[in-house]
Amino acid sequence: MATRPSSLVDSLEDEEDPQTLRRERPGSPRPRKVPRNALTQPVDQLLKDLRKNPSMISDPDQRTGREQLSNDELIKKLVTELAENSMIEAEEVRGTLGDISARIEAGFESLSALQVETIQTAQRCDHSDSIRILGENIKILDRSMKTMMETMKLMMEKVDLLYASTAVGTSAPMLPSHPAPPRIYPQLPSAPTTDEWDIIP
């Protein structure tokens, strides 16, 4: 006759469930050596190498085949996302550079137009300086003409005086080419004579 266990707990403690067994792993995983050329090669080349061999940044010795496969798939997805993000960033950078080049070109065009306008303004300023100098020369010439006219008037007065002095002793009439200068002071009235007085005797 089979003996019954004293309790159900004893029977459960004696048996071991295979599902609860845990795999023992080494406490300190071995560090993965990164290839030296991975630190010096360009980013694009590194992304290509990671797509081909994702295990270059993982340690397959520490995982089972299924874990390593899932890890490789995750690395591939990550590399793909990084590549897509880098392509998007490259497109954004190209667009930004295109906008900057367009702005620089527009700035150069406006600068050239400003230079042309500045040259034209400078030329107009040169003409205005020439006109100003010509006006000053005309003023100087006008003053010289006035001085010459005054000199001619003085010469005519001297000629009249000479003609008058030579014509005093002769009967030749004197030609008044120049009128006599006006009196400085007005002529005072003369005193009345005794004949002009109206005296009642």
Swiss-Prot record:
Keyword Ribosomal protein part of the UniProt annotation: no
Residue interval(s) of motif Nuclear localization signal 2: 181-193
Protein name: Phosphoprotein
GO cellular component: host cell cytoplasm; host cell nucleus
InterPro entries assigned to the protein according to its UniProt record, in alphabetical order: BDV_P24
Role this protein plays: Essential component of the RNA polymerase transcription and replication complex. Acts as a scaffold which brings L in close proximity to the N-RNA complex. Plays a role in the segregation of the viral genome in host daughter cells during mitosis by interacting with host HMGB1, a host chromatin-remodeling DNA architectural protein, thereby stabilizing RNP on chromosomes. Interacts with host TBK1 and thus interferes with activation of cellular antiviral state. Inhibits cellular histone acetyltransferase activities.
GO biological process, one term: exit of virus from host cell nucleus through nuclear pore
Major localisation: host cell
Keyword DNA-binding attached: no
Subunit structure: Homomultimer; only active in its oligomeric state. Interacts with nucleoprotein/N. Interacts with matrix/M protein. Interacts with host TBK1. Interacts with polymerase L. Interacts with host HMGB1; this interaction is required to stabilize RNP on chromosomes.
Keyword tags: Host cytoplasm, Host nucleus, Host-virus interaction, Inhibition of host innate immune response by virus, Inhibition of host RLR pathway by virus, Inhibition of host TBK1 by virus, Inhibition of host TLR pathway by virus, Phosphoprotein, Viral immunoevasion
Source organism (scientific name): Borna disease virus (strain V)
Compartments (UniProt record): Host nucleus; Host cytoplasm
Disordered: annotated span: 1-70, 176-201
Miscellaneous remark of the record: The P/X gene has two overlapping open reading frames. One encodes the P protein and the other the X protein. The P (p24), X and P'(p16) proteins are produced by ribosomal leaky scanning.
PTM comment: Phosphorylated by host PKC epsilon and casein kinase II.
